[in-house]
From Swiss-Prot:
Region annotated Disordered, chain positions: 1-29
Domain FBD as annotated: residue spans: 378-428
Domain F-box intervals: 29-75
Superkingdom field: Eukaryota
Biased composition (Basic and acidic residues): 19-29
Name of this chain's protein: FBD-associated F-box protein At1g66320
UniProt cross-references to CDD domains, sorted A to Z: F-box_AtFBL13-like
Length: 457
């Protein structure tokens, strides 16, 4: 122990082939580093346990160091037999039963021939042990094993990630310190079980939810006064097992919203006054052989309220499939204005460029626009006619695409209708046309902004 009361550890000089210290001895000597034990363990916590075990050959002083690291990060694939994994975990938890545990991360993807009762018994034993050790971070992937109730009453837990496990309908869940909650392919007893889990996280700041067809959740209700970030996503394969899915969000402090699930029918969101960033890829279930119906007033009302709820966002990424539905909606009634948007990113997976200019008219203060597409087709669609108003705030445009004549029409649209445009960046990756031809066409476009610079990459 030194003057600060911190233990120091010995590390081998492996980074330097030679030492400038004449008294340091040979290259293979051990050198005492001024690295406190607490800081060393903090670094080692970020290394998988299988790699930590390898450090035991570094020196005699490191032989048992990995046993003292307050965390486990294990993958079943690193063990030739499941029983060996079980023994390893049991041994580690037993050795450290009097110490606090920072992290418990376990990935088991297949049950093989093991019976359900045995798996649940292992899970119950380990969860009970880590809760007693005041674990702070839990990351469990085990298909499909039931997590014991004691985990949902862990008052030391800060982050919780569950994947593929089963969650029973408990009467009470209390996780007073959990700030990060990630639920992927989790099977819930019912919707109420999920609601209790979310509401039981009293200081929740980040929620990630991956939808699966067997999770028993048709209506996802997110109510949190502390939530800052919400990410909702699911498979894009148009799974026909999904029926009448809905998401309701009541999170007044939400700053980041990511929605990516085409077959969810309804999103009911209370106005998000603090929203900074949104990534929207939803189709309101119009993707499964359904089309927007102007006579469906309830659907139109839902879309309107959805747009109003996110209209205060500052930076938005939006999919072309979502824009297409908004475009269809706009034929029935006006689209709300997105006055706060400064950066707009549009991701095209279909050749529907004409819907981009229409939405820009609803973003009167947008300064930067990024248009991306990795889709190429010989099909041609027409850009909308000249805008009802100029793009008076647009300063920067970047277009990344396979590039053809249609993109040139889009570039012309921006250059001709943006009076304060400063820079247009064109990425010609995968372009079948000669760069010289593209450059000649660019020179013929009349520029409304005299200071506009066009850069071709």
């Amino acid at each position: 122990m030194d003057e600060d009361g911190e233990k120091h550890v010995l590390t081998k000089r492996s980074s330097f082939p030679e030492s400038s210290d004449k008294n340091s001895g040979d290259e293979g000597d051990w050198v005492r580093r001024d690295l406190p034990e607490s800081l060393l363990f903090q670094v080692l916590l970020n290394i998988p346990t299988k790699d930590l075990v390898k450090t035991s050959v570094v020196s005699p002083e490191w032989r048992h160091l990995w046993r003292c690291v307050p965390g486990l990060d294990l993958d079943e694939a690193d063990f030739t037999q499941f029983d060996t994994l079980v023994s390893f975990i049991d041994s580690f938890l037993s050795i450290n039963r009097e110490s606090s545990l920072n992290k418990f991360k376990l990935r088991i993807y297949c049950n093989h021939d093991r019976d359900k009762e045995t798996n649940n018994a292992h899970m119950a034993r380990w969860i009970s042990a880590i809760v007693e050790q005041n674990v702070q971070h839990v990351d469990l992937t085990w298909l499909p094993v039931e997590v014991p109730p004691i985990l949902y009453l862990c008052e030391s837990l800060v982050t919780l990630r569950l994947c593929g496990v089963v969650l029973a309908n408990l009467e009470f869940m209390y996780l007073p310190l959990v700030k990060v909650l990630a639920l992927e392919w989790v099977i819930f007893a019912n919707e109420l079980a999920l609601e209790k889990l979310i509401s039981g996280c009293l200081v929740l700041e980040s929620l990630r939810f991956c939808k699966c067809s067997l999770d028993n959740v048709n209506v996802l209700r997110v109510r949190s006064q502390s939530l800052l970030s919400f990410n909702y996503y699911g498979p894009s394969s148009r799974d026909l097992h999904f029926k009448d899915l809905a998401v309701t969000i009541d999170a007044p402090k939400l700053e980041i919203l990511k929605l990516s699930h085409q077959v969810t029918s309804s999103f009911i969101i209370k106005k998000l006054s603090s929203l900074v960033e949104a990534n929207i890829k939803v189709e309101f279930n119009f993707c499964v052989g359904k089309k927007f119906n102007p006579n469906d007033l309830s659907k139109r009302k839902m879309i309107l309220h959805f747009l109003v709820a996110i209209s205060r966002v500052k930076n938005m990424t939006i999919a072309a499939s979502t824009l297409e539905i908004i475009y269809d909606y706009s034929r029935c009634e006006p689209v709300p204005l997105f006055r706060n948007i400064s950066l707009l990113r549009v991701e095209f997976y279909q050749d529907r460029w004409e819907i981009s200019p229409f939405f820009l008219e609803s973003c009167p203060n947008v300064k930067s626009l990024v248009v991306e597409s990795d889709y190429y087709t010989k099909k041609r669609t027409s850009i909308l006619s000249r805008p009802r108003r100029l793009l008076s705030s647009l300063e920067y445009v970047k277009i990344k695409s396979s590039w053809d004549k249609l993109e040139m029409k889009l570039v012309s649209y921006f250059i001709e209708n943006s009076p304060v445009l400063k820079k247009v960046t064109l990425c010609l990756d995968g372009c079948s046309r000669k760069e010289s031809v593209v450059l000649r066409e660019l020179l013929t476009i009349p520029r409304r902004s005299s200071s506009c610079q066009v850069v071709v990459l």
